[in-house]
Each structure stands twice: as C-alpha cells, then as structure tokens.
C-alpha cells in the first residue's frame, strides 16, 4: 500500500505553529532540487519553475541540484541546462547513483568547481537517439538532421565544460561511455568527489 509523499513540519518565519508540507516542498525552500527520474517535459518544467522562483526570491543564495537519473528526452534536458546557466545564483550539481545521458549533461551544467559526484556514483555519456523508426522517409530525414544539430550542440557544451577537444567528445559519444566518480572527475564532468579521503 503506497504511503504517498512523506510530510514534514515547516514553520514560516514569524509563525508560532508549524504546518505540514511534503518533503520536496520543504527541501525546495532550502534550495535543494532533485532530479530522480527520467528527464521529460513535466520534470523539466518543474525544475525550471523552481529555479526561476528561487532566482527571483534571492539571487545571492546558491542552489543544489541532486541528480540520480537514467537520462531522458533531449530538449527538456537542454532546457534544464539552459535554465541553470540563466539563473544568477550558482547551481551546484551533485551526482548520487547514476547520471546517464541527459542526466550527465545536466550534471556537467553545474557551476564549474561546484560539480560533485559521490564516491560510488556512475556517469554515462552517449549521443542523442531518434524516436522515428516507422515514419515517412521525409520525416526520418528531417528528424536525422535535427538529431545531428542537437548532437553538435551537446558535443560543444561537453567540450566547453570539460575543456576536452571537440573531436575527443565527438568520438566518445559514438558509444555508451560509463565512468566511475574518479573517471568522471578526470574527464572534467565533475570537479570534486564527495567524502573522498585521499
């Protein structure tokens, strides 16, 4: 039997009594964002809306985006990345578990020097995929052209954010490349490994 989203007490400044809010709303008030699912239009719009609200509320307090995502749709992922670049506060990105495909793209979009992976996190990059398999020939050609444009956009962002040559990123994206936290740091996708002792 599902219990739903847990509720936690929260007291507004100046209030005597605490009210109950769902745990995500409480965390959002602390500027903690979570991407714990596939990237789609709905979660992208939620994250962008929260970032814009927090940006307007206080431009001086950083935001923290925790990522455990198998990836998802390309355009919603790019829109989350763009929103992270647009807001004034720094956005720290923290990979817990898996940041694959669009998840790793969003992870890379955190403020440089503030991109973190937990010690046992995994990161995966690859090229975007098409959804047209049984369309008209003209539709398939147009879709392929659009995918190539998106691939170029993603490749350029990875190259800029990791400081790797464009050709290296392009070659690596030809297949699924899985990385440990240390490998992701060496690659330039993250800057730090949390809880690291050495």
Swiss-Prot record:
Component of the chloroplastic Clp protease core complex. Cleaves peptides in various proteins in a process that requires ATP hydrolysis. Has a chymotrypsin-like activity. Plays a major role in the degradation of misfolded proteins. Belongs to the peptidase S14 family. It is found in: Plastid, Chloroplast stroma. Its main location: plastid. It is an enzyme of class 3 (hydrolase). One of its GO terms (biological process) is protein quality control for misfolded or incompletely synthesized proteins. The gene is clpP. It catalyses: Hydrolysis of proteins to small peptides in the presence of ATP and magnesium. alpha-casein is the usual test substrate. In the absence of ATP, only oligopeptides shorter than five residues are hydrolyzed (such as succinyl-Leu-Tyr-|-NHMec, and Leu-Tyr-Leu-|-Tyr-Trp, in which cleavage of the -Tyr-|-Leu- and -Tyr-|-Trp bonds also occurs). GO terms for cellular component: chloroplast stroma; endopeptidase Clp complex. One of its GO terms (molecular function) is ATPase binding. This is ATP-dependent Clp protease proteolytic subunit. Its EC number is 3.4.21.92. Signal peptide: none annotated.
